[in-house]
Amino acid sequence: MKLVPSNCLNHSEKLLWTFVDGDFLYFIDSTYALYEYDLNNHKAYFIADMEAEILRRGEVSSIIKQKTDYFIGFKSSGLIQLKYMPDSKVKYSLQSINVQSGIFCLMKDRFQDIIWVGADGQGLYMYFTDEFSIDNIMLDVPEYRVDNPVRALYQDQDQTL
């Protein structure tokens, strides 16, 4: 087997962060613009200018899309949601989510409208997109004793957390 480099994106700017979710890539380029790239039709779609938020919060650790909204985790400064506003001139509204620590990973639950958030020092969060609430599963209680931050979430062969 041989790997051959390919430049299928043909994007003019340098990519700073790239994340994969199924048939889609989410990337932020050197102008701090967030794009969604469809691997099937090979088209990139501009989503939002993230410059002010990245300059304020720092390095991006994870990006996922849940329905029409984007969730962006920052390595040392929390989680934001780009909420789709179909009737607005600006299509996405930035909303801060109440997680005050670094975000290491985001994962969509395949059975429910839940986003699992692995946080630095605050354990594992469940963000319920329908109820607009967030809950923390503290990993320092005896049933879940974990002394380290949640840096990654894994699925088994049945695709369960």
For every predicted segment, state its role:
Residues 1-161:
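Carboxylate-rich, polar loop motifs that coordinate divalent cations or form catalytic acidic clusters
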